[in-house]
């Protein structure tokens, strides 16, 4: 599972997801990309499940880049615990996704294979996505 090796602070505030992504919204390496069209949070398990779906479909062909990393800790209190007594323990890490963010990039495959692979991956993700190609306006 993806998570930071070490962090400056153990816990983080909840925050809000507003606006759209300006950084990470263009294709950097691949010919095709999977771009988020709404905001949300991706856990390391969801990122890994989508990666496995893509790599299993394209098999040995193509190169895949993961463009997001879960660096925000999410805390949770134990069940049947009274309120108060501080913030809960870190349970998992998430990547905060804004609309326009490219999640995955793919190269070395044809158009139909990339579309099908990203379609399979999109079913594993909690945010709406679309496929983008290099050269088209994003």
From Swiss-Prot:
Alphabetized NCBIfam families for the sequence: rplP_bact
Lineage of the organism: Bacteria, Pseudomonadati, Myxococcota, Myxococcia, Myxococcales
Keyword DNA-binding on entry: no
Function: Binds 23S rRNA and is also seen to make contacts with the A and possibly P site tRNAs.
GO cellular component: cytosolic large ribosomal subunit
Keyword hit for Ribosomal protein: yes
GO biological process, one term: translation
InterPro entries found in the cross-reference section: Ribosomal_uL16, Ribosomal_uL16_bact-type, Ribosomal_uL16_CS, Ribosomal_uL16_dom, Ribosomal_uL16_sf
Family: Belongs to the universal ribosomal protein uL16 family.
Keywords on record: Ribonucleoprotein, Ribosomal protein, RNA-binding, rRNA-binding, tRNA-binding
Entries under HAMAP family matching the protein: Ribosomal_uL16
PROSITE patterns: RIBOSOMAL_L16_1
Protein name: Large ribosomal subunit protein uL16
GO MF annotation terms: rRNA binding; structural constituent of ribosome; tRNA binding
Entry-linked Pfam families: Ribosomal_L16
Subunit structure: Part of the 50S ribosomal subunit.
Signal sequence interval, chain numbering: none
């Amino acid at each position: 599972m993806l998570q930071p090796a070490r962090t400056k602070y153990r816990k983080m505030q909840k925050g809000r997801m507003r606006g759209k992504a300006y950084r990470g919204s263009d294709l950097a390496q691949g010919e095709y990309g999977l771009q988020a069209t709404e905001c949300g949070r991706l856990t390391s398990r969801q990122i890994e499940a989508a990666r496995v779906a893509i790599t299993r479909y394209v098999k040995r062909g193509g190169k895949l880049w993961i463009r997001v990393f879960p660096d925000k800790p999410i805390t949770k209190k134990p069940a049947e615990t009274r309120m108060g007594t501080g913030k809960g323990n870190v349970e998992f890490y998430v990547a905060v996704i804004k609309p326009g963010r490219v999640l995955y990039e793919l190269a070395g495959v044809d158009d139909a294979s990339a579309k099908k692979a990203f379609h399979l991956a999109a079913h594993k993700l909690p945010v709406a996505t679309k496929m983008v190609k290099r050269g088209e306006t994003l």
